[in-house]
Amino acid sequence: MARNSVLLLLLSLVASAPASAQLLVGRERSPPDLSGEWRLESDEDPGQPPLGDYLGIPYNDAGRQRSDTTAESIWGTSEYRCRPHSAPHQWRGLGGARILKELDPLTRDVNAYHVQFWRSLDRPIYLDGRPHPPAYAPHSWTGFSTGEWVGNTLVVTTTHLKDGFLKRGGPQTSDMYTMTEYLTRNDDYLTVVTIVDDPIYMDEPYVQSTTYEYDPNTIVQMESCVTSALGEAGGTDPHFVPHFLPGQNPYLTEWLGEQDWIPEAATRGGAQTQYPEYVLASPSGTRRAALPLSRSALDVGRMIAAQSPRDGEVHVLPVQGNIYMLVADGTNITASVGPDGVLLVNTGTAVMVDKVRAAVDALATEVAAAPRPNPCAGANCAGNAHGWASPAMNAIVASPAPARPIRYIINTSAAPEHTGGNAKLAVEGFFARRGGTNVTGAAANASVIAHENALATMSAPPGDAAPLPPEAWPTDTYFYDFQKLSEYVNGEAVIVYHAPAANTDGDSIVFFRHSEVISAGNLLSTVSYPFIDIDIDGGGSVQGVIDGLNHILDLAVAEYRSQGGTWIIPSHGRLADTADVASYRNMITMIRDRVRQMIDDGMTLEQVIAARPTLDFDGRYGSTQGEWTTDMFVEAVYESLARR
């Protein structure tokens, strides 16, 4: 049990430290200083093994298929090209590491360490006791890290990580993994033990270690980057997704002909390949873990659900600029709040409308009507009408005005979870028409905007479904590819784009051009496969969903190192950026291509479902129960492709 032995030895050394050393009371007994320039000395695993070599990685079947089918060149596509190395690989990439201290200006305590690598963002490790963000907060390449001293070892816990790779040679991670690091300094040597716990792709945690040597002459350079990579990513197609169909990757075993030091069976990885007894026994006779030993594998469903909490409450997450994300019992609502009032993208379910209204009122009061005190005090304050200012006068002059009402509601589709609050919120809103409210018969409700096809579904739904009440219907519709709102709202242009034949025939996305935020509607969900209405009246298709996601990627721009920048709010789940949307697009594209190949091979729907073309993604997005199951998604993909 080699890797577990490393962990047990480490923990035993920590536990055996004297109590006084563990308490670290007093500045004279403070923890060791980790700051400085560190040169990579050695690590137990090569940074880039041959493609298909997963020896020692505790992969399950889903992780193995994900790695087999993902082409390494995918990291050269425009959405990923400038990303830093994934968190598990950063300690083992080229170059050394620079660790900087952030000190409290009064106590001189270390509030945080900042770690920098050759190809990385600045990675803070907070030591000030702050909590980790909620599950619906965005993920990043470096994640969110907090540290705590245990003896002379800094134990770092990192969450909110994007999907990436364990090693550059193909082994993949999901975006649900956590990483625990043990950083121990002994004189001029820094030992880093990392434990990756991925409940989607691994049966057990994956342990690695690395050694650095202190070297003040080491230079940690920053790698330059440009995002253009069309030659690598499919010629002139900017949306090309490099991947292999299951069983058709020709590069997984070609290296074994020259490097025959390892049996092919061992290259497939798995929990059993971590242990010494695997080397001594026939691969066919080795054990497999009876139960998942990953600390989070048994809770993965709860971890995913936490990205879209269904607790009957409304949670508010500031996004960027004027924009906020309201998580309303599992459904996301986008709110633009400012001096012009409130613009909502979708209104949630009918049962949540009162709590949504209360949350919107609170936001409008806090953001749009908040007092703006004069920071100057005294008789000579410039710009003050009274010639002087004081806290008391500020309170009088800048007392809160009433919150501005809801002016606009934009529905990205006719789905009940997006239109359930339309009737009540629109009636309580205000949008002056025809010169004001004194015109007889002119309604002053909020303006409700949607695509014409969404109005048709709300007013005359197919089958036996009841129509929405007329007061919930859109008051303004558009027919073309997009519609610009006729004036700025809260200081920015708002553009509504049609996503034809996507989830339905009436889907829209909404782009807030100054805040750099896109509300994606049902095109994006970080907790499920996309819903696709393939009925004749529904008009949805898998290709339309992919096209809609590609449109979002065309509009969005990453801020730096392939993350941040334009934020994308999904219909359900956590806040996303361009790399997250690309990962979701890639997943759907890979599944589409697999199902299309099966159709070309003459397989029936039942045979395709039994073949599990979604195997490597089911643990992350699949479901066997509820309103939208994995089988229903596969059927929608199959039928939308078979009809073309």
Predicted regions: what they are:
Residues 22-294, 323, 395-400, 434-441, ...:
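PEST-like low-complexity, intrinsically disordered acidic/proline/serine-rich tracts
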Residues 315-387, 508-522:
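Conserved beta-strand hairpin/beta-sheet module of binuclear metal-dependent hydrolase folds
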Residues 419-429, 581, 617-619:
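Metal-dependent catalytic neighborhoods of phosphoester/phosphodiester hydrolases
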